[in-house]
């Protein structure tokens, strides 16, 4: 689907299910941008890494306590400018692509075809291999809603008895 719209659009803004992007991050999508091809908005992965939390507390980390045990879907490298960092690898659930400059890098020179891998992490790896400039906007305030099954619904399912 991205192959179709990358050739027809100026920008593609992808938001996965359950993701909410704040207004400040939305404004970065519409700002003129000649320096980066793709901007990813790093999000927290589900769960808390209690070992990492314990290690950071023991090491007197200056990181904010509310994010010490969290893992993110994007690994960042060096700082470019305020709130923008290079991306080492990502499995981003929210991102914006500037189509024209990205298309120049991903279009096959011989056939003119565009092939984009359907898996997010592989897609971004292939983009980096082809010279697409991917950056992370770390000031993004992303809210994620995780869907889960209520234990009451599981207990009341057919064939399950609760004593």
Question: Where in this protein do the model-derived segments appear?
Answer:
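Short beta-alpha junction loops
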Residues: 19, 44-47, 139-142
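Short beta-strand-to-loop acidic/aromatic patch adjacent to the donor-nucleotide binding site
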Residues: 8-20
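Conserved catalytic core of nucleotide-sugar-dependent glycosyltransferases
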Residues: 22-112
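C-terminal catalytic/acceptor-binding lobe
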Residues: 86-163
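Active-site nucleotide-sugar/metal-binding loop of Leloir-type enzymes
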Residues: 1-11, 31-34
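Short, Asp-centered acidic motifs that coordinate Mg2+ and/or phosphate
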Residues: 11, 37-38, 134
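Short amphipathic alpha-helical segments and helix-helix/interface helices
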Residues: 2-3, 26-30, 120-125
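A short, glycine-/small-residue-rich helix N-cap motif at loop->alpha-helix starts
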Residues: 1, 21-22
């Amino acid at each position: 689907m991205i192959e179709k719209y990358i050739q027809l659009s100026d920008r593609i803004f992808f938001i996965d299910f359950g993701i909410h992007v704040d207004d400040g991050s939305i404004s970065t999508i519409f700002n003129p941008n000649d320096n980066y091809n793709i901007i990813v908005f790093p999000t927290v992965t589900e769960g808390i890494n209690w070992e990492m939390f314990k290690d950071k507390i023991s090491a007197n980390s200056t990181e904010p306590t509310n994010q010490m045990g969290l893992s993110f879907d994007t690994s960042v490298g060096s700082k470019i400018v305020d709130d923008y960092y290079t991306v080492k690898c990502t499995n981003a659930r929210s991102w914006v692509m500037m189509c024209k400059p990205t298309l120049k890098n991903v279009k096959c020179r011989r056939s003119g075809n565009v092939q984009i891998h359907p898996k997010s992490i592989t897609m971004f790896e292939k983009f980096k291999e082809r010279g697409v400039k991917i950056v992370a906007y770390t000031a993004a305030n992303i809210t994620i809603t995780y869907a889960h099954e209520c234990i009451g619904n599981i207990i009341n399912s057919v064939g399950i008895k609760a004593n």
